[in-house]
């Protein structure tokens, strides 16, 4: 779902020492791997499969592209990974949306039933099932993560937080998706990209201990799953007000009935993060500090709001 300019921009901010640790290999993941790709990549121990098309609106207007990007590409990567003799862990990066809308006070656990309500979440669920099948069929070591609404610096301006930053800066009205009566805003557990990275590193570094600790939790089911959850649940109106406050403006907004304006969208998603907390991980920085961090960076790097 990203822009390759993000990688080059981040590399420009890296030290020469860190740059030497990074190599970019270009390949269309919808195409099967070839000998040249294998030679370029060389030996590897870990794969974090985070590549995906992720915008719900686009998945509704163009579902087949999402099938190619999120299902076919995942199958190709798994096929490539299973040939490695050095693979220690494959992490498939999934989404809270595979569970569908969450009623009030319901927080979905890792092994709860799936209920995809749009093509994006359906293709991510399909990728998950492929990961489970590959672990069962080929004894590949695989973890699956679910995250909720990742945000951060350089986020695509089509997403809610960059839109709010632009609207607050320019004194424009923000659309807040709500229930049919326009009295209650949708809510999420927003999580910063740095916290997601921290959670993934925690899983990688502690993978052997984790497998032993949870092996009896789900009756020995393959592919352990982990919810990486943000610090607090936050409705979108409160989030927009936090952003406007950080920008230094008063929020202008209107509540919009999301049912009629955005088919395939859900008012509330919610994940139970108790498993990761029990294992010893939770986000280290408050949502307020993360919002300030992103707003300040974005206003200083305005070109990212135009990409």
Enumerate the predicted regions with their spans.
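N-terminal Rossmann-like NAD(P)+-binding domain of SDR-like oxidoreductases, especially those catalyzing
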Residues: 1-150, 293, 300
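C-terminal substrate-binding subdomain of Rossmann-fold SDR/epimerase-dehydratase oxidoreductases
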Residues: 19-20, 27, 168-307
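A short, amphipathic alpha-helix embedded in the catalytic core of nucleotide-handling enzymes
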Residues: 77, 134, 160-168, 199-203
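Short beta-loop-alpha junction of Rossmann-like oxidoreductase domains
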Residues: 101-103, 153-155, 159, 275
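A glycine/serine/threonine-rich, flexible loop-to-helix segment
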Residues: 106, 157-165, 243
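The catalytic Tyr-centered alpha-helix of NAD(P)H-dependent dehydrogenases
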Residues: 116-123, 153, 157-161, 189-193
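Hydrophobic alpha-helix immediately C-terminal to the catalytic Tyr-X-X-X-Lys motif of short-chain
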Residues: 126, 130, 134, 164, ...
């Amino acid at each position: 779902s990203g822009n390759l300019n993000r990688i080059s921009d981040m590399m420009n901010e890296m030290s020469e020492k860190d740059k030497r640790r990074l190599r970019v290999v270009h390949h269309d993941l919808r195409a099967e791997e070839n000998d040249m790709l294998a030679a370029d990549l060389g030996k590897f121990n870990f794969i974090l499969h985070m590549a995906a098309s992720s915008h719900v609106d686009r998945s509704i207007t163009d579902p087949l592209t999402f099938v190619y990007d999120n299902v076919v590409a995942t199958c190709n990567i798994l096929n490539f990974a299973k040939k490695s003799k050095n693979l220690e862990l494959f992490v498939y990066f999934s989404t809270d949306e595979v569970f569908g809308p969450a009623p009030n006070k319901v927080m979905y656990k890792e092994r709860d039933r799936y209920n995809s309500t749009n093509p994006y979440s359906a293709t991510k669920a399909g990728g998950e099932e492929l990961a489970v099948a590959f672990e069962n069929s080929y004894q590949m070591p695989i973890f699956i993560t679910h995250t909720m609404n990742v945000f951060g610096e350089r986020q695509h301006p089509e997403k809610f937080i960059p839109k709010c930053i632009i609207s607050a800066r320019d004194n424009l009205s923000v659309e807040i998706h709500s229930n049919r009566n326009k009295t209650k805003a949708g809510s999420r557990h927003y999580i910063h990209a740095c916290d997601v990275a921290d959670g993934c590193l925690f899983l990688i570094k502690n993978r052997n201990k984790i497998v032993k600790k949870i092996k009896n939790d789900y009756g020995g089911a393959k592919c352990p799953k982990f919810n990486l959850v943000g610090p607090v649940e936050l409705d979108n109106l409160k989030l927009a007000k936090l952003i406007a406050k950080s920008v230094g403006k008063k929020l202008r907004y209107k509540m919009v009935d999301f049912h009629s304006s955005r088919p395939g969208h859900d008012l509330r998603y919610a994940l139970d993060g108790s498993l990761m907390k029990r294992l010893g991980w939770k986000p280290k920085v408050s949502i307020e500090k993360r919002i300030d961090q992103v707003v300040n960076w974005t206003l200083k790097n305005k070109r990212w709001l135009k990409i």
